[in-house]
Amino acid sequence: MFDSIIIGQYVPGDSVVHRLDPRVKLTAVFIFLVFMFMTRDPLLLTVAVLLSFGGLLASRVPLSFYAKGMRFISIIIVLTFVLHLFMTGGGEVIVELPFATIYSGGLIEGFMLAMKLAMIITIASLLTLTTTPIDLTDGMERMLAPFKRVKLPTHELALMMSIALRFIPTLIEETRTIVLAQLARGTNFSEGSLWKRLKALIPILVPLFTQSFKRAEELATAMEARGYAGGEGRTKYRQLHWGLKDSVVLAVFLLFAAAVMAERFMGG
């Protein structure tokens, strides 16, 4: 289960998605996350599917790697679909069961929400799979640059967000190691009452928090040893360059956002 979470990991490559400016990728992901949940139109949902899988294919990330990452989230997607299927009414009756009645409205709502979740995970994963931590930090810093006028520490905020995102795989690996160690000691996480199973998590959470603080302290020490003193006066070896392909990608996502807005406010 722990190996199947890919958000926060980076896959080296030289695809067109890898070469995109991190600012356009961050903006595209933000637009997609906001407007994906706003749309209820099947045609726009189809466009979102094409955008998601088009980006996945263009990134040249192995489909097997992505499929592994969807293994865990698929449980949530299926559960969401089933809950809507049995708990949402409206429309025509499809089938009547002894314990529930399935309506066409529940089927459509469940399918659309499940697809939205899958597409959001795809786009969010593409951001970290195709963007290095340094580029991600630089992109966030440049996007937050206007807030420097109100004395906001934009570089430090961008660095914290980037580090937090990149610590996800590390924490997952730490959790997996601790769980395996506890299983080797005979700990059973699946039997007993709910209270006993919650108590069994304590030997996982305590060392996990301890290791997290230890790694944070080691990272801070390493940054200080390398002379890091914040972003003031810091120069960058690699400069960000906004090109034609970045403008095209941004225009595509802005058109998607405009179409969703038109559907919401003009289509009722």
Swiss-Prot record:
InterPro entries noted in UniProt: ABC/ECF_trnsptr_transmembrane, EcfT
Membrane topology: Multi-pass membrane protein
GO MF entry, a single one: transmembrane transporter activity
Pfam family name, one: CbiQ
Listed CDD domains: EcfT
UniProt KW Kinase keyword: no
Signal peptide, first to last residue: none
Top-level taxon in the UniProt lineage: Bacteria
Gene Ontology CC: one annotated term: plasma membrane
Membrane-traversing stretches: 29-49, 75-95, 107-127, 152-172, 242-262
Subcellular location: Cell membrane
Keyword annotations from UniProtKB, A to Z: Cell membrane, Membrane, Transmembrane, Transmembrane helix, Transport
Subunit structure: Forms a stable energy-coupling factor (ECF) transporter complex composed of 2 membrane-embedded substrate-binding proteins (S component), 2 ATP-binding proteins (A component) and 2 transmembrane proteins (T component). May be able to interact with more than 1 S component at a time.
Role noted for this protein: Transmembrane (T) component of an energy-coupling factor (ECF) ABC-transporter complex. Unlike classic ABC transporters this ECF transporter provides the energy necessary to transport a number of different substrates.
Family: Belongs to the energy-coupling factor EcfT family.
Protein name: Energy-coupling factor transporter transmembrane protein EcfT
Organism, as annotated: Bacillus selenitireducens (strain ATCC 700615 / DSM 15326 / MLS10)
